[in-house]
């Protein structure tokens, strides 16, 4: 799921069957519902840019579609990311797609041309001279810069700077014994929030050499998605224990918790934006 634009008036929803729906918040109704078949597997990322709908699937294929389904010269563009995908993210600020998955390291793509603009290079071998495996699980673009941060199944949080000549991460920090599942930029500069499959959520400082900081408590199941306000110190999260939570970024206090009565397999947080605790805008969906 994702917003269709910065106006946050439409929600893009991609299903496991590759069905795509667009929900308009102003009218309170679905304005689009059609299958967008490409490759194999579930949709792992969906975005919209300049009239084009973009979907990425587990088999590693990304395609741009016209909203109405008719392919134009540019609208039929297909991108082969070179391996299986866990996540596809879009930056409207730079008109760039970011992709990553198992043994398919971070890549950036120009949406206008479909050309690859950046390919991450794996970190050096570990202390035993063994290759460090690659498994990107989530991606986020840092606010106000071209830097991109990723999480991995092996507990790594890595920061890449495509504006430099280096392809390796400029910052890499590991949270021991944690399979990280999601990441979101916080309102604090160069700080991200990460969640793991065991229900651990941390604040990570990506300045200098990187530092794992605050640990937020109250989780029982694995964390599926995190959303942070761009302006206020609040963190929203959903987890496999069917709870939706809001924590304070600095005090670590659990401010709000509610359980869903819906039966579902996974609950995914789309995004949240709020100007104060009393004014919250959160959207969730359930995959049955």
Residues covered by each model-derived region:
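Terminal intrinsically disordered, low-complexity extensions flanking WD-repeat/beta-propeller proteins
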Residues: 1-13, 17-19, 39-43, 222, ...
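Loop/turn segments within WD40 beta-propeller blades
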Residues: 2-8, 46-51, 88-95, 100, ...
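Beta-propeller domains
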Residues: 12-36, 66-70
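Conserved strand-to-loop turn within each blade of WD40 beta-propeller repeats
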Residues: 14-17, 56-59, 100-103, 111, ...
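WD40-repeat beta-propellers
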Residues: 20-25, 62-66, 106-110, 157-162, ...
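Asp-box/WD-like beta-propeller blade repeats and closely related beta-sheet repeat scaffolds
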Residues: 32-94
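WD40/WD-repeat beta-propeller blade N-cap
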Residues: 35-44, 78-86, 120-136, 173-180, ...
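Solenoidal tandem-repeat scaffolds enriched in leucines and small polar residues
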Residues: 79-163
